[in-house]
């Protein structure tokens, strides 16, 4: 097929040079033999010297999108328009213009458990809305959009196991967010060496001293609001923010030397292979209530096993559809079970190796983006 693809290659803008979606959405399409014309949002921003998602970006990108698509469509008609866009990226009018040219349109989205509001406006204009979280179909139908379940996966030609000795007992790659600090603290307090890589585990550079003072000022503000707010709900909310702030501040001392700034994509892949155990967390804050957490699957559930890493994360029924619990991926229900299983598999290396290998076989055999795309195109009768 001839496919027009547009996306931002990064899955996390706080990680300089991240090309996560380039590796997972673009490269597998090429690998399958499709002809792909790629329009990268980061390159559009660079070309016009504007900030991605700044005030000018949406209008500029919409113009570039229509111009590029029309130009390439004139050269040779497309079989599919495929995008990873949200409401902040593109004007609805641009999508309508492309739709008028008669090319099937598909948009991919994820994080819809807590960020569905980001795609509510544009979704009805696509023929197919590919969602990674299984239950997002209900939300999409409610706004008149056509849902197609397109689960997360990983590209085995990028997430390649590396040989060598283990560098870390336990590692976590991701931001200090939601209940992650709580779980990490529980492990550290019980003597587990945990290395964390990602945003907010350390005070971000540059201007660390200034940012530290700003955070302390915010803490005082939260404390006053927790003490004097007339709303019990607000008092609870700001008390919780102070608790997590103090917990992380204390962890930076008790776990000194094991918190790290965000790492590159290549470093991340290496960490997955060189950690005895990789931790993941499915929990995110609720879209409507920041005091409540919900669960959804991430790329990590497929990246780590693809790198032949031993992976432990929260139990979920949806995850159990992809991996057999405690035989291909280790799953926990609470902090006590997490600690118990981490201790067990650090001590029982043969058992750990069996799960590591089984998880790799399942990921590489069933959960590749090459297989996801092949199944998707067969389902949509696109070849």
Question: Where do the protein language model's features map onto the residues?
Answer:
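Conserved acidic donor-binding segment of nucleotide-sugar-dependent glycosyltransferases
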Residues: 329-335, 345-349
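Structural alpha-helical scaffold elements that stabilize or flank donor/cofactor-binding regions
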Residues: 74, 121-122, 271
């Amino acid at each position: 097929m001839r496919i027009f693809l547009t996306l931002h290659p990064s899955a996390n803008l706080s990680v300089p040079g991240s090309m996560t979606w380039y590796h997972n959405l673009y490269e597998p399409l090429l690998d399958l033999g499709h002809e792909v014309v790629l329009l990268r949002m980061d390159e559009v921003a660079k070309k016009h010297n504007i900030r991605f998602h700044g005030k000018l970006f949406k209008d500029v990108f919409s113009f570039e999108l229509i111009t590029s698509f029309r130009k390439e469509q004139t050269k040779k008609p497309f079989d599919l328009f495929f995008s990873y866009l949200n409401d902040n990226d593109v004007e609805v009018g641009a999508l309508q213009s492309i739709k008028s040219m008669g090319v099937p349109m598909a948009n991919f989205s994820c994080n819809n458990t807590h960020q569905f509001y980001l795609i509510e406006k544009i979704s009805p204009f696509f023929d197919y809305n590919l969602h990674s979280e299984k239950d997002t179909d209900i939300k999409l139908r409610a706004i008149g959009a056509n849902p197609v379940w397109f689960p997360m996966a990983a590209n085995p030609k990028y997430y390649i196991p590396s040989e060598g000795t283990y560098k870390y007992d336990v590692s976590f790659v991701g931001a200090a967010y939601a209940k992650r600090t709580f779980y990490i603290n529980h492990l550290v307090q019980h003597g587990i060496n945990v290395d964390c890589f990602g945003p907010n585990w350390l005070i971000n550079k540059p201007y660390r001293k200034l940012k530290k003072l700003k955070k302390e000022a915010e803490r005082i503000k939260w404390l006053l609001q927790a003490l004097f707010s007339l709303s019990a709900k607000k008092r609870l909310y700001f008390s919780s923010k102070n608790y997590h702030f103090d917990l992380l501040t204390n962890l930076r001392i008790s776990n000194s030397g094991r918190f790290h700034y965000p790492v590159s994509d290549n470093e991340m892949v290496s960490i997955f292979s060189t950690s005895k155990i990789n931790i993941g967390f499915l929990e995110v804050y609720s879209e409507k209530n920041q005091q409540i957490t919900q669960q959804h699957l991430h790329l990590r559930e497929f990246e780590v096993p693809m790198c032949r890493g031993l992976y432990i994360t929260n139990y979920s029924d949806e995850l159990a559809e992809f991996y057999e619990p405690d035989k291909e991926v280790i799953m926990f229900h609470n902090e006590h079970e997490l600690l118990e299983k981490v201790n067990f598999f650090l001590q029982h290396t043969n058992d750990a190796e069996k799960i590591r290998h089984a998880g790799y076989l399942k990921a590489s055999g069933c959960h590749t983006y090459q297989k996801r795309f092949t199944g998707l195109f067969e389902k949509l009768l696109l070849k």
